[in-house]
């Protein structure tokens, strides 16, 4: 977690994302944003800061998601014949689970009538994830993205997977190790302050590599010396009272 910004009561993530981006040094980076942040203002801000973007598409962007979905469906029907595109595939097997991913990237964007509204738009991306778990029916999911990157399928897939891993890992750690969802603090700036402290703690704990422990166990280890010291103080205090 590099930064966060509290949204106003009558605002939302859409208006907050460009403001948050301004706080970060992004030059030369690839910025991935979920579907809510797939906005022309967000794309423009990222390009302004000399970075690249991979923005997730869903139905919240009018016809954009439908148009990109239809484009890739058509491209598949003609087997991408005469189209400029790049493709890669990965396969991972682990403990009764098989995960395959395929990625197509094309720079064929001239057909998109709203291209000028999206700063730096250079490519469309389709990622297919197929998962087989022992004893369960296979599942297939396709996701679509717009990007300022050139047609490099391996690079695009790394960016997309990195986004999923960070998002899933961070949310899981905050919920399981820090019990964020159970927190009922609602007064004043307390929720924002506590969230900031949690994110700082997560960053510090993940940088601690002297022991092979999970974040939750690292938290416990970090406070153990303090707990022991407190326990000894109590013992000493009790002994003084007893001797007195």
Residue ranges with predicted function:
Residues 1-29:
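Electropositive, glycine- and tryptophan-enriched low-complexity nucleic-acid-binding patches
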Residues 14, 39-43:
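Short, well-ordered alpha-helical microsegments
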Residues 17, 30-38, 53, 145, ...:
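Short, conserved catalytic/metal-binding motifs centered on acidic residues
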Residues 32-40, 58-63:
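Acidic, metal-coordinating catalytic cores used for nucleic-acid/nucleotide bond scission
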Residues 43-51, 73:
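Short, surface-exposed basic-aromatic patches at helix termini and helix-loop junctions that form
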Residues 58-162:
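An anionic, glycine-rich sequence signature occurring as long contiguous blocks
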Residues 81, 173-244:
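A short, flexible helix-boundary coil/loop motif
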Residues 150-185:
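Short amphipathic alpha-helical "interface-anchor" segments enriched in bulky aromatics
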